[in-house]
Structure formats: C-alpha cells, structure tokens
Amino acid sequence: SHVQAVASKAGIIRTEKAFEGIIYKGVGKDYNFTNLEEYLVDGKIPNLKSELNTEVLISEYLAKRLHLKVGDKFLTFFMKENGKLPNKRNFLITGIFNSGFQEFDATYVIGDIRHVQLINKWNSTDVGAFEVFVDDFSKKKKKGDDVYKEIPPTYNSITIEEKFYSIFEW
C-alpha cells in the first residue's frame, strides 16, 4: 500500500487561442507517478522534489484544445470567494499524458501541491485528501472500509469505484 497527500483547486486555463475549465490536482513529493508514467505520450514527469516550481502534466486532450505542447507556459486563473480578483499562476508543461479516461483527461492538470496550499492560504501540512493505493485491487473495498472506521466522523472515505462510478460501471 501507498498513501499520498493531494489537494485540488478549480481553475481556468487561458491561452491566446482558447480557454478551458480545469481541476488543478496538487501532489506532493511523496506522489507515486509510476501509474501515470505509462500514459505519458510526450515529455517527462514534473520534478516536485525541490522547492516550489511551476512544472505540470497536462492531458493530450487539453493540450490539443488549448494549442499547447511540452515546453509551453500557460496562465491559469483560480477564482477567489467574494468576487475578488482571481489568483493567477503561470505553469510550464513538462509532460503530456493520455490516460484513455475522457472524464479524467478533460479535467485534470497535475502539479505541485504547494500552489493549492498558497492559493488557499493553508499551512504546508494542510491537504485536501489522502489517496490510499492497495497492492491488490480486489481488496480496495475492505481497505476503504478499514480507513473509514479509523477517520473522524467529519471525514469521508470513498473507493476509486465510488468516486469514478461511470468509469467502472461497465
């Protein structure tokens, strides 16, 4: 098993030619990119081991819609509450992936969790969720139940099948 911290933030990527709504998935130094590496179609995995940087993975689907490629920079706007001016972040594409799951590919950009922490004014220990990976996929339900029993009642635990029901329903 492997546990990794993540935090997500909705945003809008704007280029000279297009714009797309996205979810920026912030991941930490402990993130296991092994599963994503097999879906890499160009470039490389971002280096999140050192200080905060702007390197991200973007899907082939989003890259095509936004006319972007590895090495390109793009601007992302993250909305603030109360109608204040949005936070802006420039990101650098180091890799392009194609997972084959349209729901995922049309939505997610993956980069440094510290951007989400800064935008949300969180501490460096604050995260949005923990992802728990199991060695045996057939035991995911039991692991999900075990986690649920151990967390405070104000938290929730769901399996990947529950989160992405439409992918697994077939």
Model-derived features with residue positions:
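Extracytoplasmic/periplasmic
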Residues: 1-3
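The feature marks short, hydrophobic/small-residue-biased sequence motifs that occur predominantly
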Residues: 7-50, 93, 110-113
